[in-house]
Amino acid sequence: MVRILIPSGALGLGYDPEALERGIANRPDLIAIDGGSTDSGPSYLGRGVSKYARSSTKTEWAGLMDAARRAGCPLVIGTAGTCGAGLAVDWLLEITREVLAETGQSAKIAVLKSDQNPKDISAAFASGQVTPLPAAPDIDADLIESCTNIVALAGVEQISAALATG
């Protein structure tokens, strides 16, 4: 059996420190947390920024980094920085490096980015490789190419490959 500890629905929403400690006592194989949600709408992805304040994100992330260190297991975040855009991933990576420097710790970090070039997506749309979801508004090449951030979904395969690097 694999034990995965999920301390909260998303980084930045807060978590119960006592529940986290109880979870660590159960010797998790992995601590995982989501960094965002589509519930917030497209604004954060469009701007490439996090919904949550840097200070609260840093405080929570530092606590989870410490928990993973004490548990001796990997820590994984999905959709870093609320939206998973490259700028938001870089923002969380910067926070991670700050926490490591401030605590004198080191860590092996795998960074998965899925930013897509709007021109490539537009070409795929034109050739029928990309299609709108049912009930989606009409789109065209100009609309696609005007997007500031387009990210692809990453499946378990990418995360598993990153974890396999040690």
Predicted regions located by residue number:
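Metallocofactor- and cofactor-centric catalytic cores in central/energy metabolism, strongly enriched
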Residues: 1-124, 140-144, 148-153
